């Protein structure tokens, strides 16, 4: 079995990082408040009813309504989010909420291990009809398993681990009764708009095996590593066209997790090759998904959630591009690739920075903390956020869980060297050496930052910054040496209390084309994607950064996309004829 090495580049745990940036922190706090105020009886209504229990609570609506076959998916995300907030920040209120959910789940669990908000008969239907008549039952079971596993990991709740193991073994026994081809049909999600999607169940089962060392759980996890995708990826065959994006992104995460567990090179190659293929399908916000190349007219695949051909063009600006769930899963993939493909780590770090600002942070409302489903970027777009109790889209759930870890992937470590990848005001608490690194930054309002060291005694540190992001470093109160190494600016020195580095950031406005389109392009300021919110931009005209953080021209105003809330906006500009893209509201029908 392969063991994680501290010599591999990895993100510092979220528990060691505290957000200070007002935008990141505010949105995280909004989600935390939403979870804390949510009526637990409403959350667990469908679990109780499915177990034959009475409930006087008002049932949830949207994708969690009692008649929706996906009911229970948000509950899994809710539990995972509560557990992560508790583990990462010591939040006692949300720990109590997570533990209370586990108690209710224990009461709802069947003796055979089955635990869900929907009846077992949905799995019978899936086994009988294979890809019709149900809506993604293993997708929902993944969310429930993940919530329980997170509660075990972050809250040290052994009961949650036992419930997860029992549910995993229940699933294992079901598959043991099926033939090879029956399993292949059930888990082959190659149609557009697939109803047999199974999410990241393989990924979470690898985590469950790491916790329990139950070999049947490991065998089950491997079952979800499907060769129609991973075999082709390992061999370098681009078969992504027409696949449902967020069905298959978690399969790549699972493959890379399998490599982490077993060391099987095939699954590392699958992840690395997948990334080379997804790059040509990735928008300037770092995220993917739009219409399928061969879509069904009138279906979701005509606008959203799929991958098209290995290029982007103006037809991809449907209003349903860039599903938020895809952003969260892409972030997980990039974390693994940083460890297991160090040759391309600069590219992965730059991608992570762009993704975090422009698709992860951008997913959340600055007023409610709730998420967009899709993130439209064409002409005259509008953001549409989930309502607190009426939608419960997949991205509502993945959003609350992602908010609990917004502080991840700012700071990294490799062989004792500390890498700062984003200039988001935050504190990194180090155990060895004992010190706190305090980053103060107002980027993108101001292209500078200050990194201060707090310590009781002088410490030796090796700090690295991407040269593409940092123009100059000046040390104050510390004796340092600066060198350039493989695209990084490396500062090595001894730091005492109050010593600090003054950072001058690389931040110029540049054009980013849409694929090979010559007339369709967007503007980025450093890693930050800009949206036109007023007027008309004339290509190549100079823009000035004002005191409010907006960029103004002769007759136009641009704003960082993640700061747009209710305004009509355009990300991808057209210097030729007008685009056909409109706002994404129809993608939610």
Language model features with spans:
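A conserved hydrophobic secondary-structure block that centers on an alpha-helix together
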Residues: 122-211
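Well-ordered alpha-helical segments within folded domains of soluble proteins
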Residues: 24, 68-87, 133-152, 193-209, ...
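C-terminal beta-rich recognition modules with glycine/proline-rich loops and embedded aromatic residues
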Residues: 16, 271, 349-358, 363-452, ...
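Glycine- and aromatic-rich loop/turn segments at beta-sheet edges
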Residues: 43-67, 108-130, 160, 171-194, ...
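Low-complexity, Ser/Thr/Pro/Gly-enriched N-terminal "stalk/linker" regions
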Residues: 1-74, 92-123, 158
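Structural helix-adjacent loops and short alpha-helical linkers that scaffold large soluble proteins
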Residues: 7, 11-14, 18-21, 86-99, ...
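Surface-exposed beta-strand/loop patches in extracellular or lumenal glycoproteins
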Residues: 459-468
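Catalytic-core region of carbohydrate-active enzymes that cleave or remodel glycosidic bonds
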Residues: 260-281, 316-367
